[in-house]
Amino acid sequence: MRSTIKLAGFLILVSFFFIQARATQPDFQNIFQGKDGCFVLYDLKAGKVACQYNESRCQREFAPCSTFKIAIALMAFDKGILKDENTTYKWDGVDRGSPSWNRDTSATDWLKYSVVWYSQRITPQLGAATIEDYLAKFDYGNRDISGGLTNFWLGSTLKISPNEEIEFWKKLWRNELPVSQRAMTLTKKIIPMEISPAGATLAGKTGSHSTKTNSLGWFVGHLDCKQGEYLVAVNYGEDKPPARNTYPGMVAEKLCEKILEEMQLY
């Protein structure tokens, strides 16, 4: 009788955890809604991938777009081109169609509003040889900057996969990149952060590229929640332009939040 009770209790416990596991498994097809998308969740404490969707896309390289601002920030802080999070560049007066871009911009606002012209002030100061050296040390994607100093990361020659983005962010969050500790600390400080109703923090960077016939969206970030500490990457593509007044990177960020909510992590 006692063994029967123990067996029944064990089966109930197994059933409970099975139900819990099913409840926290995202419905990826419903979330991406026809988009060719992928997702990676890396558990920093366990040191392994906790969840991955569409592995083949996670292995493909794409233009990093504005997610590359993280690498630019690391280089610029390390070289002293940016002194701190308040380093400000003056607006050149050119109307770029956005109030947040048409003004003097600090390093913090550069990432917050994803100001492309701020990046384009930094990369010529770094120079091609220096950037190539850093990218080799970072082991960043295909390291190809032949597309030009002011746009090689913007739908051009530089490519990186979602899996490679996770590896790069892993080195950043573990303070293992070949730059100064101060450069890594300041870079992490200026990464935009959101706080969920449950108190989880998600610090990350969007990336967008689009033409008249296609869209590419990125979100890569760091999640700190009661269940642990994770790195996340979302990437998707569509054979159509984004909706009016919509940036694919913002869509990718919302997709990431939805996935994490369904996993009960955010």
Predicted features, each with a name:
Residues 1-9:
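Bacterial N-terminal signal peptides that target proteins for export
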Residues 8-16:
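Bacterial N-terminal signal peptides
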Residues 19-63:
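Beta-lactamase-like hydrolase cores
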Residues 24-31, 124-129, 174-200, 204-266:
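Structured C-terminal helix/loop/strand segments within mature extracytoplasmic catalytic/sensor domains
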Residues 61-85, 110, 232:
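Active-site SXXK
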Residues 78-93, 179-184:
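Short, well-structured active-site flanking segments
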Residues 87-103, 109, 115, 126-127, ...:
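Acidic helix-start/capping segments at beta-turn-to-alpha-helix junctions
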Residues 99, 106-107, 119-169:
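Mid-domain, small-residue-enriched loop/turn segments at the edges of structured enzyme/sensor domains
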